[in-house]
Amino acid sequence: MKLLIHSAQESPIVPLENNNINVIHKDNLDIDQIPNYLYNEIECYDYLEYTEDETLDKLLAKISSKGTLKLKGVDIYQASRNFADGNLTTVDMSKAIANGKRRCFSVHELSEIISSKNCSIVFAGISGLNYMIEAQKND
């Protein structure tokens, strides 16, 4: 089974025939109510930035052995670089890094944190302002 957590107003488009994907808005998710090891894949779009510090550990606990965690969010260094270069207005920068978020990440720091939690980084990269990380649990 797969869990897809998003923060957008509209849900992502998921194939209708694939009923093994649970799509949940970040505001409707109670991570503590999900049994551990339930999902073989969890995908998060702009989710970690809105959460408490221990949420990454809780997400990893919900993934089965050798399962996958995919994360996407705004990379603070990319946003800062684009702002400093004049490619982002103050309003756009505020939307990218603030907008109700509790914290910011960079692809490098988040990759190191995930690696320290018994996971292998399969992919880590940047596209525009966004980081993308795919990790696999080693247990």
PLM ranges: what are they?
Residues 66-78:
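Conserved beta-strand signature within the Rossmann-like core of class I S-adenosyl-L-methionine
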